[in-house]
Amino acid sequence: MMTRKVPIIAVATAPGKAGVGVVRISGQGLGELVETLFHRSLAPRQATLLTFCDADNQPIDQLLAIYFVGPASFTGEDVLELQCHGGPQLLELVMKRCLELGKALGLVIAEPGEFTLRAYLNNKVDLAQAEAIADLIDAQSEAAVRGAARSLQGSFSEDINGLIEEITQLRILVESTLDFPEEEIEFLENAQARERLAAVKKKLEALQAGAKQGKILRDGIQLVLAGAPNVGKSSLLNRLAGEEVAIVTPIAGTTRDRVKESIQIEGVPMHIIDTAGLRKTVDEVEAKGIERTWEAIRLADLVIFLGAPNAEPGHESLREEILGALPAKCPILDVINKSDLIEGGLAVSSSNEASPLLISAKTGAGIDALKQKILHVVGWNGAQEGAIVSRRRHLDCLERAAEHIAKSEQFAANGNNSLELFAEELFLAQNHLGQITGKLLPDDLLGKIFSQFCIGK
């Protein structure tokens, strides 16, 4: 996909019936195809109402055609967009006819993300902006939409590029000193290198904090409700969802398989998974459900370990077993349900941060406190103004850059004797930051990133 120079075509709108469906074509020299399709030229950047005909010159649709002459287009190439009526069969016929008439030009069906890849390769967007297009389409909340839009406008890229520029200026000073050792100046003091490095570190830490919030906005939180049978996991799911999505009975072991529901808490997507109660069983179906419970726990971002006054014996040993299965850095939140059965109710709840949170899924008592606790535990700070969406890839690059900045601090502490190593660590930090916007990224990784996009994007 990285080296294809031929024109490409795809339906750019979602599959299914709709009022409008868009067929998009991109490539060099599409003026010839326009003439062949419509027997006339089109004024660039103007919508023209036209009749689209099949090979027998029979009308297929009346559509709007818009022709963008490169480089003044999304991809940087010539682009033709056909705004048709949105029937799947109709769009298929339009695609078929375009491919027939575009065969001489080498017109082929686009691969996933190929339009956006061409925009990136032609410097219309950087990699972070290209990813923001996909994130905008996949946004699960209003906050995620706004965050992706900021990234698409270049807010995240500007911060990254600004930090790269500061490191570049620091590297210039270091390397110029290495080139003229006879000057014997105390570079680190005279150039205020340590102060500059401290400023870079502070900005990088702020970027990391913002990116962590952005990943929560983009991906949401995989929240697993786990515990023994009959502690109220399904009741809690229903309470959080605001509707009855899971069957609730007094019979232990009612939930035999995972039940998943997505909600939002203060704009943060939460993917809640109700699981089969964990216990030893000879029931083959229940055992399969328990196996899937452990699978969900191993993939969780947060586990709510639910107990109740009437929980089966072995509560603490079960908790230890869950802790052993959790992924690294995955927190566990201890919650006691059915507080309405406890004498004094919520009054017995301790103010100790480590003590279990008391709730009642039946009455709703303590649910608001639970929601706030969830947000706190996953690291959401509630700051949505100016937030951007980010990916695991971005966090990894920022983390590696931070590691090299930390090493450069160590070499800076050694004075002029370690300037070469100081410069090398700055260079490596710069490289990792550059991978976020795509300035320094292997072609195979680029292909992997864009292959996750929709066809037509």
Swiss-Prot record:
It comes from Polynucleobacter asymbioticus (strain DSM 18221 / CIP 109841 / QLW-P1DMWA-1). Its cofactor is K(+). It comes from the Bacteria. Binds 1 potassium ion per subunit. One of its GO terms (molecular function) is GTP binding. GTP binds at residues 230-235, 249-255, 274-277. This is tRNA modification GTPase MnmE. Belongs to the TRAFAC class TrmE-Era-EngA-EngB-Septin-like GTPase superfamily. TrmE GTPase family. Homodimer. Heterotetramer of two MnmE and two MnmG subunits. Keywords: Cytoplasm, GTP-binding, Hydrolase, Magnesium, Metal-binding, Nucleotide-binding, Potassium, tRNA processing. CDD domains: trmE, TrmE_N. It is an enzyme of class 3 (hydrolase). It is found in: Cytoplasm. Residues 220-379 form the TrmE-type G domain. One of its GO terms (biological process) is tRNA methylation. (6S)-5-formyl-5,6,7,8-tetrahydrofolate binds at R24, E81, K124, K457. Its EC number is 3.6.-.-.
